């Protein structure tokens, strides 16, 4: 699961850099991907804790 949170952080950083450089479409897409990866990570972490 560490890889999943790592990917989310990478996409978050990519989105912030793209936003600063003015590529708003790329930034929005990267933020969406990062958001879903964080949600998946949290769900999997909760399932792991419960099992």
UniProtKB/Swiss-Prot annotation:
It is a multi-pass membrane protein. It comes from the Archaea. The chain crosses the membrane at residues 1-21, 31-51. InterPro entries: DUF1328 (IPR009760). Keywords: Cell membrane, Membrane, Transmembrane, Transmembrane helix. GO terms for cellular component: plasma membrane. Signal peptide: none annotated. It is found in: Cell membrane. NCBIfam families: PRK13682.1-4 (NF010229). Belongs to the UPF0391 family. This is UPF0391 membrane protein Mbur_2216.
């Amino acid at each position: 699961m560490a890889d999943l949170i790592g990917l989310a952080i990478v996409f978050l950083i990519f989105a912030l850099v793209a936003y600063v450089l003015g590529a708003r479409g790329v930034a929005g897409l990267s933020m969406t991907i990062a958001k879903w990866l964080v949600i998946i990570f949290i769900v999997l972490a909760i399932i792991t804790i419960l099992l």
